[in-house]
């Protein structure tokens, strides 16, 4: 069917409990699209935020190619995992967010705007045991491939008439 691009901006998070015992937490997120027919899942990773502590700011754009037929089968899931970067030991998982792409697509179609706009959403970060660990803030946008987005362009005005053309000379 229609090839589209799912653009996800991973904005920030708010983690409830400190993971590191010593020093500031350096949190980062990996976003992976599972369920696609293209073989291995597409993945994007944010940089570790060493300044934000339990409230990191990333503002990282991740783009995933999806087909409308894949969305309709309800197999596509965007998995965002928030991790804590550590120096001496392996990185620790804070928690994950599993987002069905079909729900995002249905929400974006309910707005029915001619020019698509990003939609801000928040999801609960859950531990492996299902306990809430924080909130992940992101925005998303579906773009149809092959169509030009004319929203940043402006129509040019007509050039001014020269005085010699007005007189008919």
Regions found by a protein language model. Name each.
Residues 1, 146-169:
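Peripheral membrane interaction modules
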Residues 3-55:
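Calcium-regulated, polybasic anionic-phospholipid
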Residues 6-10, 27-31, 46, 62-64, ...:
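Structural signal for hydrophobic/aromatic residues that build the beta-strand cores
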Residues 20, 73, 79, 83-153:
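C2-type phospholipid-binding modules
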Residues 43-48, 63-65, 119-124:
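Short structured motifs
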Residues 55-67, 97-101:
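A beta-strand/beta-hairpin structural motif
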Residues 67-73:
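Short Pro-Gly-centered beta-turn/loop motif in secreted/extracellular proteins
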């Amino acid at each position: 069917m229609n090839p589209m691009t799912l653009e996800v901006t991973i904005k920030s998070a708010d983690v409830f409990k400190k993971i590191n015992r010593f020093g500031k937490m350096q949190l980062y997120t990996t976003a992976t699209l599972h369920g696609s027919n293209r073989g291995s899942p597409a993945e994007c990773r944010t940089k570790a935020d060493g300044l934000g502590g339990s409230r990191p700011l990333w503002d990282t754009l991740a783009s995933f190619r999806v087909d409308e037929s894949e969305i309709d089968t309800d197999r596509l899931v965007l998995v965002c995992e928030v991790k804590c970067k550590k120096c001496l030991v392996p990185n620790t998982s804070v928690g994950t967010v599993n987002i069905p792409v079909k729900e995002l697509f249905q929400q974006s179609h309910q707005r029915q705007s001619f020019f698509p706009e990003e939609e801000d959403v928040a999801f609960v970060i859950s531990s492996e045991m299902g306990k809430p660990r924080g909130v992940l803030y992101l925005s998303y946008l579906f773009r149809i491939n092959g169509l030009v987005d004319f929203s940043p362009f402006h129509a040019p005005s007509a050039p001014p008439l020269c005085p010699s053309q007005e007189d008919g000379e």
